[in-house]
């Protein structure tokens, strides 16, 4: 009463002090101050100069010849900003909701429609898993397919792929390329179960795998139930002439191809939105075993990209 506060406020203060160990209560006796004199207070050590070696930052060169970037001058900033405003206006409740582990349905439906019209692929939205970058999806695939298998990658190839597999405790073997792409005979000699390839536009050679080699790979995968082809369709959107070659998934009749692509080349590398298309039985396995993983792309970006597509 003297302090001008309510009884509830005083009781809450006592409960807080008891909860933190500064006081204790005895029935019918009252409240008592706890003895904290024996508690040792550990002083923070004197801050020393750290020697953390960070990777060097990329220089803003006058001429950028790197192959993994897009021209920022061509990005449709005005359209993207407009779609972001529309998303905030039309998706107030959805933006505050947790995204499904595979990504929001609107984006998965937009991707499925895009793949149908642009790549000739007939996929169900429920087969599509959205993630922040292909590197994250590679890690999910190791967890889905298992570390007891041998993963083969193209040699030469994108070094980071083998690094990610090895960091996820998967055995990874480089397989040499010939003029038509990765060698199926060498895959067999390596006793591999998983072949990670980029048949449409191989990095760094630029080789496009011919149709006969694609069928050879499918025949290899069909020889055993535990064999799969990871088709990395990175940088497949652009060709000097004609339409892009249909992906291996479009000729896969036995559900042996896992398709991966990203929007980092068609939009910008800083928008970390990628996706993979799983065969039906692997999609069911993913949702049964790995659905506890949260989608790593914000709902805001997902809804905005869905409207953009």
Positions of the model-derived regions?
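N-terminal basic, amphipathic alpha-helical segments
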Residues: 1-85, 291-298, 306-309
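Residue-level recognition of strand-loop junctions within catalytic nucleotide-signaling folds
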Residues: 34, 200, 279-280
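Walker B catalytic acidic pair
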Residues: 232-233
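A generic "structured core" feature
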Residues: 3-9, 17, 155-165, 192, ...
């Amino acid at each position: 009463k003297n302090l001008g506060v309510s009884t509830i406020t005083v009781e809450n203060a006592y409960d807080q002090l008891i909860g933190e160990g500064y006081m204790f209560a005895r029935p019918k006796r009252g409240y008592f101050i706890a003895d904290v004199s024996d508690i040792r207070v550990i002083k923070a050590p004197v801050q020393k100069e750290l020697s953390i070696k960070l990777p060097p930052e990329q220089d803003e060169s006058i001429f950028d010849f790197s192959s993994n970037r897009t021209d920022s001058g061509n990005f449709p900033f005005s359209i993207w900003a407009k779609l972001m405003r529309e998303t905030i206006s039309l998706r107030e409740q959805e933006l505050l909701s947790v995204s499904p582990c595979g990504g929001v349905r609107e984006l998965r439906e937009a991707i499925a429609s895009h793949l149908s019209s642009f790549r000739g692929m007939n996929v169900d939205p429920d087969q599509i898993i959205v993630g922040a970058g292909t590197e994250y999806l590679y890690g999910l695939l190791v967890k889905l397919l298992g570390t007891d298998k041998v993963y083969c990658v193209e040699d030469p190839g994108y070094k980071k792929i083998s690094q990610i597999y090895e960091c996820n405790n998967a055995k990874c073997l480089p397989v040499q390329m010939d003029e038509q792409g990765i060698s199926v005979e060498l895959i067999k000699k390596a006793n591999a179960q998983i072949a990670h390839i980029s048949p449409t536009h191989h990095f760094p050679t630029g080789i496009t795998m011919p149709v006969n080699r694609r069928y050879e790979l499918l025949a290899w995968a069909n020889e055993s139930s535990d064999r799969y082809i990871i088709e990395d369709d990175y940088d497949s959107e652009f060709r000097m002439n004609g339409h892009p070659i249909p992906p291996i998934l479009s000729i896969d009749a036995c559900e042996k191809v896992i398709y991966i692509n990203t929007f980092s080349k068609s939009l910008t590398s800083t928008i970390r939105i990628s996706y993979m298309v799983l065969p039906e039985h692997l999609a069911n396995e993913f949702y049964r075993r790995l659905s506890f993983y949260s989608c790593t792309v914000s709902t805001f970006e997902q809804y905005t990209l869905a409207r953009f597509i």
